[in-house]
């Protein structure tokens, strides 16, 4: 099994997370404060060094004022899995 951390789809998810943060006009420092994390942790997640689990993703999005379900729908519309990419 390959690691999804390195897939195009995961990179698209990270890019969308960055867009959501910048659209909300929230810096990495401010997001870190809202999450009670460090700015380095936020940066590591946004660059793919550290993986977010689904619970962390939900908390992250809530801190920015977004719902997980809406984020997943948006991600799915811009990065659909091809049949041969399904896990």
Per-region residue spans from a language model:
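A short, Lys/Arg-rich alpha-helix, primarily the initiator
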Residues: 1-23
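Short, charged recognition helix plus adjacent turn
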Residues: 1-7, 70-87
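Short basic helix-loop element that most often maps to the first helix and adjoining turn
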Residues: 15-34, 59
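Recognition helix of helix-turn-helix/homeodomain-like DNA-binding domains
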Residues: 36-52
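Short, solvent-exposed alpha-helical "recognition" segments
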Residues: 51-54, 81
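DNA major-groove recognition helix of helix-turn-helix/homeodomain DNA-binding modules
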Residues: 55-71
